[in-house]
Amino acid sequence: MCKGRRNTFSKSTSACEIVYRILENWSTGNENFVKEFEKTVDRVLENCYDGHGQRNDCGVRRLKMEKNMKSKIVVDSSANVYELPDVGFACVPLKILTDEQEYVDTAEVDAPALAEMMRTYKGRTSTSCPNISDWMAAYEGADEVYVVTITGTLSGAYNAALLAGEEYEQSHEDARVFVLDSLSTGAESRLLVERLAALIKAGKPFDTVCEEIRAYHEHTHLLFALESLANLARNGRVKPAVAAVARMLGIRVIGQASDAGDLEVLCKTRGEHGALERMVLEMKAHGLTNGRVHIDHCCNAAAAERLKHMVHAVFPEAKVEVGSCGALCSYYAEYGGLMVGYEDSEAPTV
């Protein structure tokens, strides 16, 4: 028996301490203890639900912290996010394959050098997604797992992550796994990952996080401007003839991720300035006002910064950040490419 322990509960009493005192006092017929325990049960109900029987997220947050549930965000490397501070996080790499070498898309890969090499490479190239065991290993150690994958139309990553989630839940009692097909890649996926982190830090319960990230996803978008379509053609994403004509005429292709997750060509332009102008017009047409914008570039920092200034000229309150593509996005965006993820004006806040 632990001496000096008072048989009362306070708002700071931990769940473990409550259980210990139940075992210690319940069989003794301690009436004061029973009364305090009943008060604690009332506190739990009061914390979890309001007067109308609806879930009280703030109360759930307090009890969740007592239980010490471990949350983790898991993303494949197409999001160009390799680390995330202040929240459980894992990045599962995709791979770029050539006849001579395999490149694992981690933060250590020299993505600009890879993009430069691909400009003149004549051999076969392809990409491969993480398998089920890769995803399972990334989920390990978490009770609540939130996953964001590259669009299922480009990769099998989503299906593998989904199957891994089912296995993880079966082998880990009380674990829950939510898998979101971004229907996109790159900068838009990064927006989703960062919103997940904000929801977790806010102490939202699992079901609420899932519901709110789905709602947020309805208001995020991806644009891209590509100088070359060679690797997309090699992997069957566009017709080789289209890629050849674009290369010969020096055409830049402006496109977007469609609602179905396909890469959809919007227009073709000549010259960088025209391409950037069209991207700003597309963002305006889709409702960008003062939201967040992520610009990722492949060996084209000058164009990315120029686009940032053009966005601010039209939307002074927009929150614009510039980053670089990782290996997988560099492979598809190719040398000089830009990928832009942005929120529209109806994007919900945390």
Predicted regions and their residues:
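Intrinsic disorder/low-complexity segments enriched in small, polar and charged residues
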Residues: 24-29, 62-64, 68
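Mixed-charge interfacial surface used for oligomerization/domain docking
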Residues: 66-71, 78-90, 94-95, 100-101, ...
